[in-house]
Amino acid sequence: MITSRVLRFPRKPFVDLDYSRHMPAAYVERTKRTVPRKVFGDRFGAPDIKMYYVHPDDYLPSHRRPWEDKQLSSHLQRSDKYFSAQLSNKYFELRRPKSERMPDTEWTFFPGDLVQVMVGKDKGRQGLVLTISRDSSEVVVDGLHTRLGEDMEGSEKLGVDKTLRWQEQPLSVSKKQVMLVDPNDENPCEARWQLNASADEYIRVSTRSGYEIPIPSQAKVTYEYLQPENYIEVEGKDTPSDAVLERTYMPRVASFEQEIMEEMGIKEDRTPKPTFWY
């Protein structure tokens, strides 16, 4: 009875809208270097001791994706410093500002949204969101809040002239450095999630005017496709959903070795020796 009621609740698809939603979670954690380096188990009932490359509490979030080359090299350097601090029995200096991840139900920014910058030299200007970072609760706006920086660091050592370009800097959502634009009057506003009139889907509305702020199509872009309806399955490589959902495993009171022996037609005539536990 309770299960049927839960299944009738409207889904919250905005929680899953992320570029890496189809990437294996284990791969993303490895690029962040927040996985155990070694696990000391079999401690007679005591919890396992885990030695991390970088403890998840000490992870340094960024507006860049963790698998990008520059960010990955930064994570590798940080994990080496973290490990050397453990070997020398010293405290690891974090030297980073505290940033808390906003709850998924409160996050209302997606790539392609029209937003307005509230701080800096571009205060009051509007632009489109390029990328978002859920870990650091930051967004990058196309062509706004920029800073002049090197296009490729260390290029002069390779005999290439140093080139400069304007680079977009992240804007914090939790500090309200950037706000959504209300489609009613094109002024900055805050947004919230609420059920639509038929109570079967969550929509994003402005808290000031109550107008719906539609989710842009760019928010559905993932590593696998640009739009889910345009995705084409590759025969021989993509497993069809019908084959994935087909139930083929039948639980039996037998070990893995016994099941293999039955399939191969092997009969066991030997009598096992008694086993004693102390």
From Swiss-Prot:
PROSITE patterns: RIBOSOMAL_L24. One of its GO terms (cellular component) is ribosome. Its main location: mitochondrion. It holds the Pfam family KOW. Gene3D superfamilies: 2.30.30.30. GO terms for molecular function: RNA binding; structural constituent of ribosome. Belongs to the universal ribosomal protein uL24 family. This is Large ribosomal subunit protein uL24m.
